[in-house]
A protein has these predicted regions:
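N-terminal secretory signal peptides
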Residues: 1-35
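Conserved small-residue
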Residues: 22-25, 43-299
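Bacterial signal peptide processing site
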Residues: 37-39
Length: 299
């Protein structure tokens, strides 16, 4: 049966306390909790959580196709076989290109690109307006927890999001195509989950050092491993037989190494794995033994 009434704030929190980690951000948890009403009597226990699907917007509502739309709900099944539904919503932590906290008292460019020496890669296509390149295409993301986190400044529970950035489409001049020409960044976001409301707040952005794995190329979909790591992907493996004439890969090598010929095509097209540390930093490795194929969304 479906429970027709909305639960109280206290009941909702009691139910969700049984969930190992509920990845709700600000407006989603607010929508869940602020609509609560009714009595504060003892509630049945949590059994399971599921999400409903939503139809993709069509040209019948063109405006909805140009923005982020959330029409799905969270359904909580209880031990008395009742189901309580909560409307979800969307709220970003930042937009790529924003300056965000680095967790050390400073700021860092979200989605920013770095070379093999971890120096910012500069977009100089507009004279007098030189700036660091940043991605316009965040892609695969894993939301996870780590045992015994040591990140300072948290008021609630530490939750980590590993976010990879697939590419940037254009340089700032709007004419220079940059697809596949920059080393894909991966970041670890440290999120502070309020234990009263469930709200997630960004407290730290860490850019993962990928120099030991020769940088990353076109990281697309991702998966969360059963052991709590982020399984990335290099969507395409560059063709080594024609690499000397591959303008995209030569530009990639130039941006990464400062040399069009230094990047080795056999270093790309592999399975990268990111392991988050308790302090919100991370390490990365590539599983070369798995071969050079499109490993996107490996489970």
């Amino acid at each position: 049966m479906t429970q027709p009434t909305m639960p109280t704030r206290r009941k909702a929190l009691q139910l969700l306390a049984g969930v190992p980690m509920l990845p709700l951000s600000a407006s989603a948890s607010a929508a869940l909790l602020t609509a609560c009403g009714g009595s504060d009597s003892a509630a049945p226990s949590f059994v399971s959580a599921s999400f409903t699907s939503m139809a993709a917007p069509t040209l019948a509502n063109a405006a909805a196709m140009a923005t982020t739309t959330v029409g799905s709900t969270l359904n909580i099944k209880l031990s008395d076989d009742s189901v309580r539904s909560y409307q979800l919503a969307y709220q970003p932590f930042f937009v790529t290109g924003d300056m965000v906290s680095d967790g050390k008292g400073g700021t860092i460019l979200s989605g920013g690109y770095y070379d093999i020496n971890n120096k910012p890669i500069i977009d100089a296509t507009v004279a007098g307006k030189e700036r660091q390149y940043f991605s316009d295409s965040p892609d695969g993301t894993s939301l996870l927890t780590v045992a015994n986190p040591t990140v300072t400044g948290l008021k609630g529970k530490a939750v980590f999001a590993v976010v990879q950035f697939e590419y940037t489409t254009w340089a700032q001049d709007g004419k220079t195509d940059m697809y596949g020409k920059l080393p894909s960044p991966i970041a670890v976001l440290t999120l502070d989950q309020d234990q009263t409301t469930g709200k997630l707040s960004l407290v730290k952005y860490h850019n993962v050092d990928t120099s030991k794995v020769h940088g990353l190329w076109i990281t697309c979909g991702a998966s969360l491993s059963p052991w709590g790591t982020h399984l990335s992907s290099e969507e395409y493996e560059p063709d080594a037989f024609s690499i000397a004439s591959n303008a995209m890969f030569k530009a990639y090598s130039k941006n990464l190494y400062g040399d069009e010929t230094k990047a080795n095509p056999y270093h790309y097209g592999h399975m990268p794995e990111v392991t988050v540390n308790p302090d919100g930093t991370a390490s990365i490795k590539k599983h070369f033994c798995m071969g050079r194929i499109s490993h996107e969304l490996v489970q």
